[in-house]
Amino acid sequence: MLRLRPLAVAVLGLSAFPVSSLVHAETLLGAQTVTAKGYAADTLETPQAVEILQAPAAGGTVAGALLRGKPGLAAQSDGAWGQNPVLRGLKKESVVVMVDGVRMNSAQPQGAIASFLDLGLLERAEVVKGPGSVLYGSGAMGGVVNLITPDVGFSAEEAVGGRVGARFSSVDRGVAGAALLTRSSAHGALMLGVAGRDVDDYRSPDGREDRTGYQSDTLLAKYKHKLSEDLTLRVNLQRHEDEDVWYPGSARTGAGIPKPLGTATIHSPEQRRELYELGVDAKLGEGTLSAELYRQEVFRQIRAFSSAKQRDYVRNDVRFVTDGAKAKYLFPLGADHLLTVGADLWRMRGDPERYIDNNPPAFDNNLRNDPFDKGEIESAGVFVQDEFSLGDTRIVAGTRFDRVTGDAERKGMTQTTGLENADNNLSWSLGAIQPLSERLSAYANLGRAYRAADMRERFEDSARGDGYFHVGNPQLDPEVSTSLELGLKRGGVGLRYQLAAFYTRIDDYIAGRVTGAVHPQNGLPFKLTENLDKVTIYGIEGSASMPVGAFVADAGFTWLRGENHQDDEPLFQMPAPELTLGLGQAAERGFWWRAQLRAVAEQDRIATRFSNGTENPTAGFVTADAEFGWRFGKLGAFESAGLAVQLSNLADKRYHEHQTEGVSGNELAAPGRGVALSLNGSF
């Protein structure tokens, strides 16, 4: 197997960790987004809250961590690698995660699919909050996270370029590196990228946190070929691999884990993602057709490690393969009128192979015990989106019809009939943005989105770490959300801000219902996966920045509430209210800096009945961070170069986020005080 030693790559350098977060990691009002409307559009003219995020100047660890502290965003964590994006309180299957516009499909028992791309090869992350099913189908209830790698373009003359750099961090004794090389001409454009990362167990105020290190590498190749002025072919190849990833938040005793096994912890010795995509862009008449064929494979080794036996007692290998095709045609109907029509087809297959040792006291029988056999989910959808103006008001309206079918050869250990199910889903959205002045606009957005049940919810019968034996339900109805968002956006020079208030209602919420019955063999209480009552999530969020003399001050905040109407209690794992305050000084060249305080309130609104006591209150905390650096102009062979230093958790505060997984009262502490240094250059 190919392993890219990060130290070797770091000697070459890491793809220029993007410039100061003072400029980029905060919301970029007036920036371009390709995710919100399906084509390039100004965020100021988009009737939804959008965040454009880049990695901090001194780099970062995984993509999910970029969302932490941003308005309406958070990250659910079960370890250093497993950082799941949380959008307005919704996560995992309720959020669509994409790489270069291709959705990543995979069951998510532990870890985070957003981590299947190294930040060294990330150009930016576009986060569109609120319903997005019109363009992206199932799961886009909380929104969409699109991880975008650098694009490659044509040039009139043959040209060669690239960027390199390196990152070293103290808190996890980490080394990261990556490099990008581009070669372009009038008819061809090639980009090759490589990234590697090797991190040790990180240090918290309690000391080194066991099993938080891992190794990863990413390969990227993109090619464009211009067949004519009206026709371009595209190829996008990606491979990401991780080794020795542990999920400390999964550590459990009891709850179906035999006492002689001690503490059981989930880990992944190896996992990888591969993408093969072929695309075409063609001018047809007055419009443009874009179409793609792709295959994306996510392979994961999932193991349960016994502290008493000092070996794995559950071994599960699973590969989720998604084959897809999508196309859209964008054409103008007038000077200020754009219509998009499209179709989106994909099929995901999963066939886990699980072996378990369940013969006490030896626990060595290696019994085949697959949770399901040959699961399959197919989705076929068509959509239309219309953008036009009525006077000064810009309207974006769309609708989509999807048919989602699920089936498997076997559910659990015995059931082979009644597994097929098909549902039809209608999504729609209506947004309007109205200028109030030259720089200030108000917007409103009303939309409906949905989430079809995933494979585990449909087909898996097994014990889980919450102390219940979960029973899948292949006849689940999809969750359906209805959302309303009202907001303000102000751009230009001087004071800039965006403010949004939102309300989301989710009907046919998929969750486990406690029946009172127990499993006859292991004695665990049953939890049947069913469509329950509605849940609601509502809140307000915003961000702002403004010059203060030679400096720039910025702020961001989030406040939201979630209600579980079935159990008449707060919704499980809702992010706590928080406020971020920053001050810094930007510079095109020379010295730049930024300092930040992040204050997170106590979260005492917890689910007790739904979680069976596994969610507990989380104390509030305040952290201080800073970063500074120097931007050089031309330096030797580099057209530009930079140095950046990131100082994290300056007070060495012990805390954990409310979304941190783990036994109540014993959650994994966040990293302590640390320093990260990055060097980068482009040529």
Predicted segment positions?
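Short acidic/polar hinge/loop motifs at secondary-structure boundaries
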Residues: 75, 103-131
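Periplasmic-side early beta-strands and strand-to-turn transitions of outer-membrane beta-barrels
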Residues: 162-163, 179-271
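Short strand-turn segments of transmembrane beta-barrel domains in outer membranes
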Residues: 144, 149-183, 212
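Surface-exposed extracellular loop regions of Gram-negative outer-membrane beta-barrel proteins
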Residues: 241-243, 249-257, 299, 349-362, ...
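Gram-negative outer-membrane beta-barrel transporters
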Residues: 334-336, 389-395, 404, 496, ...
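Outer-membrane beta-barrel signature, preferentially recognizing the C-terminal barrel domain
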Residues: 257-284, 318-320, 371-379, 420-435, ...
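Signature of Gram-negative outer-membrane beta-barrel scaffolds
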Residues: 340-440, 463
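N-terminal periplasmic "start-of-domain" segments of outer-membrane beta-barrel proteins
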Residues: 30-59, 84, 92
